[in-house]
From Swiss-Prot:
One of its GO terms (biological process) is aspartyl-tRNA aminoacylation. Its main location: cytoplasm. It catalyses: tRNA(Asx) + L-aspartate + ATP = L-aspartyl-tRNA(Asx) + AMP + diphosphate. Residues 199-202 are annotated as: Aspartate. This is Aspartate--tRNA(Asp/Asn) ligase. The lineage of its organism: Bacteria, Pseudomonadati, Pseudomonadota, Alphaproteobacteria, Hyphomicrobiales. The keyword Aminoacyl-tRNA synthetase applies. Keywords: Aminoacyl-tRNA synthetase, ATP-binding, Cytoplasm, Ligase, Nucleotide-binding, Protein biosynthesis. Its EC number is 6.1.1.23. It is found in: Cytoplasm. L-aspartate binds at residues 175, 221, 456, 503. CDD domains: AspRS_core, EcAspRS_like_N. GO terms for molecular function: aspartate-tRNA ligase activity; aspartate-tRNA(Asn) ligase activity; ATP binding; nucleic acid binding.
Length: 604
C-alpha cells in the first residue's frame, strides 16, 4: 500500500464498498456525535466522510484531531446509512470506517477558518493566502484559471501559432507606465527593467522572419491597483502575426476568444460574430469606447432638436451656443416608475459633477404622445415628437438628457445609460457580449499645448494612403485630425480585454507620423533607435493584440475583483503581505550594486 494514499478524497464511489483503502488530507470538519466521530477529510480532489467509533483502535487518536490537521487514515469503504447520503458530494453515497489514523501535520489555531466560506478582511486573506486558497471557491477559481490558460494555448496552436519566450530583463521603456527597475551588478549605475509588455520583442520576432507568435506573457507595471487590474504584474495572451491586415487579426483572434468563453461559460450566451463598432459611433451611442452591449439602450444626439427656435429651455440652449451638445438616454417603461426613481437619478448625476439630468416622460393623449416633467413645458410638442422618434420611445417611456461640452456630455450619458439599464432591469446579465472597437483617431488636438498630438498608439499604421500621408502638410489640421489608425480594442461586458494594432513597419511613415505630432527625427532615434534600426533592415507588415488573461479569467469566474483569480496577488498598495515584499535589503547587497539610498524624510 502506498505510504500516503491509495485513493484521493474525491474518488470513492459505491463500487468501492468493501475495499480497504488509504486516504490523506486535511480535516475539513470534525463532528462529535457522542462516541462516534465524523471527520470530513479534504484534499485537492474532493471530500470524503470518515467515521470512527469507540470500537476502533484509531478512536483515541481521532479524538485529538482538530480542523485543518493533516492526517492519513486507513479503513474500509461502506455505504452511508439510508437517508444520510449527501447528493452534493460525488463521494456522498459512501463513507470510510477508520481502522488506523496517523497525524502527518498539526495546525495551530487558525487566523481564519477554511470551512464555511465566511467573509474575512482582505488583509487577513492576503496575509494568509495559503489558507484562503484551501477554501472551495478560491481553489476552484485558480483551477479554472489553469484550465482556461490550457485552452488558450491549445486554440492558439490549432490556429497555426507557435509559442515563444521573450526576455524578462530588458531595457527601460520611455513610454507607458513606470518601469520596475533592476540594478546591474556587472554594470554599475545601469539598470534593467522588467517588461511592461513584450511589444518590441514580439515585433522583432516578426522582423526576424517568424510568422505567428504567441506567448502567455508576464508583464510588469508600476501602477496603482484597480478592481480589474492587479498592481505589479499581470499576464496577457500576447499575439503577433506577419503579412496580415486588420481583418486577418480579427479572424484569427475571434474564434480563440469565442471558443474559450463558450467552453467555460457555464450556460451563459456568448456573442456569435463580434460586431465591429467605429470609435466615433461607440462614443455617440454608448458614451464610452468600451461599451457594455448587454445593455440595450442607445444614446442619441438631440442637439439639433434643442436648437429649434421654439425650444425655450435656456440651460440647454446656452450649452449649444457655447459649442456643446445634448445627448438623450432612453428609459423604456420608466413612466411607470415613482417620482423617487427620477429624483435618485438626478441626485446621482449631481454626485457625478453635473447639475442633474433633465427628463421627459411620455404619455398618450388623444392618440398622440405628450410629454410631462420638469423641462417638458419648455419643449413644444413637435420637438418632443422628434426626440421620441429619434430615441425610439413610445407612451410609458421616458428620456433623460445630458448636456455640456461633447466629451463631458458623452461621458455622463454613458454612465447614465449603465445606471438606467441596471435600475430598470434591462441589462441581460447572463451573457458575454463582445465587440471590436475600430477606427480610432490617429491624432487629437492637445488643448493645453495648442498642438496636434497622438491620440492613442503612436506606433500603429495610419489608415491613409502612404504616399499621400508622406506628403501631408503638418499645418493641415483638418485633414490630420480626420485620419484614422489601424487600431482596435476588444471589449466584453464593458471591460476592455485588449488593445491591438497593425504596426507601422515603414521608417519613413513613422518619421512622418512623429513629425506631424511635433517630434523630430532625433527624438525617435534617441528613444526608439533599436526598433527603427530593425525596421530599416526589411520589416514585413505585421500586427497583433494582447488580451489580458487575468481579465478573461475574472469574467469567466464571475468575480468583480481580479485578486479573486490570481494565485498570490498583492494588495492595493502593491505589497505582498504574506512574503513581506517589498522589503529592505542588507547594506552588503546595496554595496554590491553600488547603490546608496536617499530616502524621503518620513517625519516631514
Amino acid at each position: 500500500m502506498h505510504r500516503y494514499r491509495t485513493h484521493t478524497c474525491g474518488a470513492l464511489r459505491p463500487s468501492d464498498v468493501g475495499a480497504t483503502v488509504r486516504l490523506s488530507g486535511w480535516c475539513h470538519r470534525v463532528r462529535d456525535h457522542g462516541g462516534v466521530l465524523f471527520i470530513d477529510l479534504r484534499d485537492h480532489y474532493g471530500v470524503t466522510q470518515c467515521v470512527v467509533d469507540a470500537d476502533s483502535a484509531a478512536f483515541r487518536a481521532a479524538e485529538a484531531v482538530r480542523s485543518e490537521w493533516v492526517i492519513r487514515v486507513d479503513g474500509r469503504v461502506r455505504r452511508r446509512p439510508e437517508g444520510t447520503e449527501n447528493a452534493d458530494l460525488p463521494t456522498g453515497a459512501v463513507e470510510l470506517y477508520i481502522t488506523d489514523l496517523e497525524v502527518l501535520g498539526q495546525a495551530v489555531e487558525l487566523p481564519m477558518p477554511v470551512f464555511g466560506e465566511l467573509d474575512y478582511p482582505e488583509e487577513t486573506r492576503l496575509r494568509y493566502r495559503f489558507l484562503d486558497l484551501r477554501r472551495e471557491k478560491l481553489h476552484a477559481n485558480i483551477m479554472k484559471r489553469g484550465a482556461i490558460i490550457d485552452s488558450l494555448r491549445r486554440r492558439m496552436r490549432e490556429g497555426g501559432f507557435f509559442e515563444f519566450q521573450t526576455p524578462i530583463l530588458t531595457a527601460s521603456s520611455p513610454e507607458g507606465a513606470r518601469d520596475f527597475l533592476v540594478p546591474s551588478r556587472l554594470h554599475p549605475g545601469k539598470f534593467y527593467a522588467l517588461p511592461q509588455a513584450p511589444q518590441q520583442f514580439k515585433q522583432l520576432t516578426m522582423i526576424a522572419g517568424f510568422d505567428r507568435y504567441f506567448q502567455i506573457a508576464p508583464c510588469f507595471r508600476d501602477e496603482d491597483a484597480r478592481a480589474d487590474r492587479s498592481p505589479g504584474e499581470f499576464y496577457q495572451l500576447d499575439i503577433e502575426m506577419s503579412f496580415v491586415t486588420q481583418e486577418d487579426v480579427f479572424q484569427a483572434v475571434e474564434p480563440v476568444l469565442r471558443g474559450v468563453f463558450e467552453e467555460f461559460a457555464e450556460g451563459w450566451r456568448v456573442t456569435g460574430t463580434f460586431p465591429r463598432i467605429p470609435y466615433a459611433e461607440a462614443m455617440l451611442k454608448y458614451g464610452v469606447d468600451k461599451p457594455d452591449l448587454r445593455n440595450p439602450l442607445i444614446i442619441v444626439d438631440v442637439t439639433q432638436e434643442f436648437s429649434a427656435e421654439a425650444v425655450t429651455f435656456n440651460a440647454f440652449k446656452s450649452v449649444i451656443r457655447a459649442g456643446g451638445v445634448v445627448r438623450a438616454i432612453p428609459a423604456p417603461g420608466a413612466g411607470a416608475q415613482p417620482r423617487s426613481f427620477f429624483d435618485r437619478l438626478n441626485n446621482w448625476a449631481r454626485g457625478e459633477g453635473a447639475p442633474g439630468l433633465g427628463y421627459i416622460v411620455f404619455e398618450e393623449e388623444g392618440g398622440v404622445l405628450s410629454g410631462r416633467g420638469p423641462i417638458a413645458k419648455f419643449v413644444p410638442p413637435e420637438v418632443q415628437a422628434a426626440i421620441a422618434a429619434k430615441a425610439g420611445l413610445k407612451a410609458g417611456d421616458a428620456v433623460f438628457f445630458a448636456a455640456g461640452v461633447e466629451a463631458k456630455a458623452a461621458g455622463l450619458a454613458g454612465k447614465a445609460r449603465i445606471r438606467i439599464g441596471d435600475d430598470l432591469g434591462l441589462t441581460d446579465k447572463d451573457q458575454f457580449a463582445f465587440c471590436w472597437i475600430t477606427d480610432f483617431p490617429m491624432y487629437e488636438w492637445n488643448e493645453d499645448e495648442k498642438r496636434i498630438d497622438f491620440s492613442h498608439n503612436p506606433f500603429s499604421m495610419p489608415n491613409y494612403d502612404h504616399d499621400g500621408f508622406l506628403g501631408l502638410d503638418p499645418a493641415d489640421a483638418e485633414t490630420i485630425l480626420g485620419i484614422k489608425a489601424f487600431q482596435y480594442d476588444i471589449v466584453c461586458n464593458g471591460i476592455e480585454l485588449s488593445s491591438g494594432a497593425i504596426r507601422n513597419h515603414r521608417p519613413d511613415v513613422m518619421e512622418k507620423a512623429f513629425a506631424i505630432a511635433g517630434y523630430g527625427r532625433e527624438v525617435l532615434e534617441q528613444k526608439f533607435g533599436g526598433m527603427l534600426n530593425a525596421l530599416r533592415m526589411g520589416a514585413p507588415p505585421h500586427g497583433g493584440i494582447a488580451p489580458g488573461v487575468d481579465r478573461i479569467v475574472m469574467l469567466l469566474c464571475h468575480e468583480p475583483n481580479i485578486r479573486e483569480v490570481v494565485l498570490f496577488p498583492m494588495n492595493q498598495r502593491a505589497e505582498d503581505l504574506m512574503m513581506g515584499a517589498p522589503s529592505e535589503v542588507t547594506p552588503k547587497q546595496l554595496r554590491e550594486l553600488h547603490i546608496r539610498l536617499n530616502l524621503p524624510d518620513r517625519s516631514a
